[in-house]
Amino acid sequence: PHISSPFILITGTSSYQVSNGCSIDPILQHPFLIKWFCTNAPAHAKIVPLPIGFQEKERSGGNQESISECHANKTPFERKKDRILLPYHIIHPPHSPEGKRAGESRVKAIEQLSSLPFVDSQPEKLPWKDYMVLLDKYKFVMCLEGTGPDIHRNYEALALHCVPINIKTIMENLFGFHRLPGLFFSSWDHLNEDKFRNYVDFNYNFGPVDVFLKVKYHADLIKKLQNENRGF
């Protein structure tokens, strides 16, 4: 059906980049579109980037009580290790072009990053709570993209006040939009010991994180836009 009145579009949540395989221009050019709240979305004046957040509630990493407990008991940033954790990353089977590409990219990145003297690797998968205990010990956490740029690990790290490290993707826009602490590299070749030592001394602001990780923050953004555009 044709939409003939102003609207705010909300879509989610998917590990795939929204613009993969098709153009989103018809949506963005719709004359009545006010804003589009979207996961794994490119930067655009009409798009508000949404996080994919934590795992589904049926999985251990989606249990709200467990997440809240980990957050409440997190180690203060200044007491964490001045090192980077490279957690265990699933290598996606090549069931799709995205899965094949993600698997190959992760294998290459893991080989390169695990050789760095300031990086500690987690070779085997741990139960979620044990994994979060390990994560909490480090100031910095590698977040290698999967079938899409956004992954749950970004938010697991932020919940523990660890700094996520990503390759430069559309995720840099999400972090910038919501004022979240994070490091982004155009190539892993640019991550060396001298640069890392400089990053250790940065003053990271985790103030916006605790608000951002609540559903209310995103709901309030939507309500604010609704109120601003009444009678549009």
Residue positions per predicted region:
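Short loop/turn elements that flank and shape the SAM/SAH-binding pocket of Class I
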Residues: 191
